[in-house]
């Protein structure tokens, strides 16, 4: 666990190990909403050379990890994210997303209360777009604080419009267990078969198992983390 801080099962406050390979029966009837940002730790934010990286250089970087499966990775990446920029090859998150998908699958397999999956893909314009869809970028939108946190979001009209939609979804989920909200397409519960994921962006849309093949390639390699 990051930095050595870890939950401790005490039978009271934390009755079940949160990293158990099975979803706890205790919460079977409680709806869940889970998601990640597209870029999370956004390598190009911290490595300036990656901001203008060419596809050829990005492929060289990927070959160090994926070796002979690099072409397979690239094919799956193109399918998941058509029209991507070369820096997306190093920026798209594979630390949080696989675990979130696994958790959603375990919850859905209980066949109890629904689980809703999202991916936040809106890119901040701040500092010439350096942050992209970085870690925690979704939080000001969920709480509709995009103007208050303009140093992170830019506070512009597009950010405000998305903040209205996302905060409505979060409020509806808190009130009813269903995040569907005005201005958003129908948000279906997640299942392993369909993999419905709400993509939050200026044009919000639901995609189905859009990165399934890509994650299968990524998960074939044991090195995960940062």
Annotated model-derived regions:
Residues 203-226:
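Tryptophan-rich aromatic "cage" segments
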Residues 159-182:
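Non-catalytic, well-ordered alpha-helical segments in soluble enzyme domains
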Residues 1-157, 169, 176:
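Substrate-gating cap/lid region and adjacent catalytic-acid/histidine neighborhood
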Residues 126-130, 195-197, 208-210:
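Short, solvent-exposed polar/charged micro-motifs at secondary-structure junctions
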Residues 134, 164, 190-192:
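A structural signal for short secondary-structure junctions
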Residues 171, 180-207:
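Mature extracytoplasmic/periplasmic domains
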Residues 155-156, 160, 208:
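Short, flexible active-site recognition loops that position polar ligands and cofactors
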